[in-house]
Amino acid sequence: MSPSAFLRALRPHQWTKNVFVLAALAFAAGEKGEAFSTEAAVATLLAFLAFCLTSSAVYLLNDLVDVEKDRLHPKKKHRPIASGALSIPAARLGMVLVGVGGLALGWAAAPGGGVAGVLVLYATLNLAYSFRLKHVVLVDAFCIATGFLFRVEAGGRAAGVEISHWAYLCMLFLALFLALNKRRAEVMQLGEGVATTRQSLREYSIAFVDQLVGVEQGHIMEYQNFNK
């Protein structure tokens, strides 16, 4: 196993998405009207690291499932598994090890199993996403958005704070906005070649996604006005 290829397959540049886990610290400070405790900060940081490992295991799974289609993609064909830099057996072994490591960190973040339970739900959702749901238009975007909500929930459980329904709605609208813009970028990049890749992308068009993005922008603005 090439260490550099394996590291690239983990997609550490995508770990920035897991900062949603740390949002719970801001909610904790706002709820209590004071700085969050050291214990809450350490637990939330462990939850953040747990999500980094678990999300990397999910990326490995997705790349294993899509390896043949990725080889036809102008950009994804350079990924370690699709390019052959990382063998399929090595990727499978790495996926298991990284996933177990993520669950262990999740348990350490909240010994009662609260964070680990969220990680299991996140992994289960992405298992369904990799094999089926990503091929269903709009459902694929909602799956991505739900993944961000799981991050927020894990952070809340680690920090010992309950996230409000309004905060979840705000996060959902923001996550959907990001997911739809990602789909828009993919459609623009692939152009006519979209038919050779993911099935759901064939159902998206620039005009259709722009309409959805506009709706999400309206939802975000309404939420901001409501909370003024």
Regions found by a protein language model. Name each.
Residues 1-7, 13-14, 131, 149-228:
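C-terminal membrane-associated helical module and adjoining short loops/tails
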Residues 1-67, 71, 84-97:
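Topogenic membrane-insertion module of multi-pass membrane proteins
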Residues 19-23, 45-56, 93-104, 108, ...:
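Generic alpha-helical transmembrane segments of integral inner-membrane proteins
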Residues 27-32, 128-132, 181:
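Structural signal for the C-terminal ends of transmembrane alpha-helices
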Residues 27-49, 103-117, 152-170, 225-228:
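Helix-coil boundary and interhelical linker segments in multi-pass alpha-helical membrane proteins
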Residues 54-80, 139, 180-188:
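Acidic (Asp/Glu-rich) catalytic motifs at the cytosolic membrane interface
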Residues 67, 72-117, 165-176, 211-217, ...:
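Multi-pass membrane catalytic core of lipid/isoprenoid biosynthesis enzymes
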Residues 137-147:
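Cytoplasmic-side transmembrane-helix entry/capping segments in multi-pass membrane proteins
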